[in-house]
């Protein structure tokens, strides 16, 4: 029997000055990409600022979405079902990088290369969406048909639109996923519930109420 697992591509727009500069060039609202290995967003990785309030020190990071920095962050979350083998390959690849975290730097020149459509390689350096795409390249999962060095967050938004499970405030998603986790562990609800499925259902209900359907 084939066992499948879920990974999540998370696009965010933090509203910082650096994010605003990228937005000016890309014309996209969400300009940061991350890969998550659980629906509760406890295992989220990307390339970005290592200190929340210092954009000049950046590299490989394990993101903490419950930090107040993300309280007003907009996001879109995409769920991809992959084989257990592909899941393990991606997760182990990222964990291997995390063991040498200080070796990896943010590839600012790579962003310039994307804008100019010129490949600019730098050893052990990535920008956020390049990192996410490169992790996917380790497997059979290739949602964006271009080299990782040219992949932007907007490319994920366009190619994964059918897989979107949430769009809105990241803090609201975190609240819903936390509620789902509590429900699934409750003695009154022993049957486990995937927090992402629960969150998507809650979001649909919220939208239907807003439209007057319910």
Task: State each model region's role.
Residues 1-214:
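Cysteine-nucleophile amide-bond enzymes
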